[in-house]
């Protein structure tokens, strides 16, 4: 009834095939529904990143409390991080079966509330006082957080025209460096204010923010709104993200759709690059806090705070590079970013004083976070329309497998180099990460660009 009063067509409408170029002289406007959905999905991503990254900021103090060696800490982090990969593909298939567009948000709400509630429990010492209990709770958190990533990415893409997909996913993914930055700031404040024994307080925040946010999102995401949005996209001469306001993968077709998507060369090669890049990104997060504490001699609070400097330029990079990929092309942008990342991580060899450490972090940060939305845009551009979340789930799974490998590898390299106090292991880690970034760039060279070209 509401949609009829507003004059909105409630039936599923087909795409307007008017070429975008025919409206080339008209300024294309983005509907407010796109901006509101982007803000909500961005805030969800900030919470996801904050919660996921916090354990890395707290690495030295957790290792100290439970008397963990570098290799033992690497094993703990690997177990927690590999949980991010477990439910991505089955969860994405389930999400695609439930429905795309406005229905996707209804799927997202209980998921976000569930994993932030588990995180809250891990912040209560009476529940998580032992290492086993704490690790099991964090594994539960990451099962949900990993599942939520491709769902959130797909949700963002389905509220924006295809020509602006790179920009939208880039802005969405600025939530990750912001969340990572907040994790360092909050960890530093908690440790400095309450002492190192109160580090669990850091895990209480996410649920408090998530509850009102998800109540709003459940009410906001409706068929009427997204249908109005798609009609507006048609009127602006741009391409809808989907031909109808909601579609789904039919029952019994999920595995067939997944296998077709996995066989897509663009998606599988981009997933390989994603895995290697995540070894780099997770590696620098695992390595920097103990490097600053054990080698540079900073306090626990200072090492947590100064290990996230690269997120300052990471936010800027996540807007510029994905936006540039809309016109320059996803493939070429990823190749440039891969080479930049390899050089940036190798430069940590020269980070022998604080000014150099800060400068190198800022240089590395310009691409450290930028590549993820471009990977998702590449997968979304190459996927079947109804299988967007499945394609993004493959990317996410590859990413989190890399995230599980990375702490094992970094812990072993630090141990091999002589342990926490010896700089040699950290140098081995930096050059190993540089090689991974370079190898990922070579994989991307073998893909074909599917970027929509009528973005301007």
Regions found by a protein language model. Name each.
Residues 55-56, 264-315, 406-407:
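Extracytoplasmic gate region of multi-pass secondary transporters
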Residues 97-112, 327-338:
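Cytoplasmic membrane-interface "Motif A"-like loop-to-helix N-cap segments
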Residues 113-128, 339-352:
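C-terminal ends and interior cores of transmembrane alpha-helices
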Residues 137-174:
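Cytoplasmic helix-loop-helix junction between adjacent transmembrane helices
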Residues 172-225:
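Helix-loop-helix hairpin linking two adjacent transmembrane segments in secondary transporters
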Residues 325, 330-378:
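C-terminal transmembrane helical hairpin of 12-TM major facilitator-type secondary transporters
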């Amino acid at each position: 009834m509401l949609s009829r009063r507003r004059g909105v067509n409630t039936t599923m409408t087909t795409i307007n095939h008017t070429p975008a170029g025919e409206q080339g002289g008209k300024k294309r406007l983005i509907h407010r529904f796109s901006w509101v959905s982007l803000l909500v999905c961005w805030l969800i991503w900030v919470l996801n990143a904050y919660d996921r990254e916090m354990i890395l900021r707290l690495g030295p103090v957790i290792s100290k409390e439970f008397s963990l060696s570098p290799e033992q800490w690497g094993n703990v982090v690997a177990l927690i991080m590999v949980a991010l990969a477990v439910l991505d593909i089955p969860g994405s298939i389930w999400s695609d079966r439930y429905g795309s567009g406005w229905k996707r948000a209804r799927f997202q709400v209980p998921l976000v509330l569930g994993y932030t509630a588990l995180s809250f429990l891990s912040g209560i010492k009476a529940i998580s006082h032992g290492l086993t209990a704490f690790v099991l709770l964090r594994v539960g958190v990451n099962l949900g957080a990993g599942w939520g990533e491709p769902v959130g990415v797909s949700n963002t893409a389905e509220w924006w025209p295809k020509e602006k997909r790179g920009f939208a996913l880039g802005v969405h993914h600025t939530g990750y460096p912001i969340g990572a930055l907040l994790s360092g700031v909050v960890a530093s404040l908690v440790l400095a204010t309450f002492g190192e024994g109160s580090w669990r307080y850091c895990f209480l925040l996410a649920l408090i923010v998530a509850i009102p946010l998800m109540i709003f999102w459940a009410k906001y995401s409706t068929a009427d709104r997204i249908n109005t949005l798609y009609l507006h996209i048609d009127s602006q001469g741009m391409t809808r993200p989907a031909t109808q306001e909601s579609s789904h993968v039919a029952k019994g077709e999920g595995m067939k759709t997944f296998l077709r998507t996995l066989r897509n060369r663009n998606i599988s090669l981009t997933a390989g690059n994603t895995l290697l890049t995540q070894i780099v990104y997770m590696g620098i997060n695992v390595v920097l806090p103990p490097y600053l504490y054990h080698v540079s001699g900073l306090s626990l609070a200072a090492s947590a705070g100064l290990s996230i400097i690269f997120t300052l330029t990471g936010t800027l990079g996540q807007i510029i590079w994905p936006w540039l990929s809309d016109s320059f092309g996803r493939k070429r942008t990823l190749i440039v970013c891969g080479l930049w990342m390899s050089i940036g991580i190798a430069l940590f060899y020269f980070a022998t004083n604080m000014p150099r450490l800060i400068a190198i972090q800022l240089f590395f940060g310009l691409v450290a976070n930028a590549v993820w939305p471009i990977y998702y845009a590449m997968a979304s551009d190459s996927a079947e329309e109804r299988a967007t979340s499945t394609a993004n789930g493959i990317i996410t799974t590859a990413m989190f497998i890399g995230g599980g490998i990375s702490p094992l590898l970094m812990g072993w390299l630090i141990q091999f180099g002589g342990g926490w106090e010896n700089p040699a292991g950290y140098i081995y880690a930096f050059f190993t990460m540089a090689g991974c970034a370079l190898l990922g760039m070579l994989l991307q060279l073998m893909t074909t660009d599917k970027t929509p070209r009528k973005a301007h």
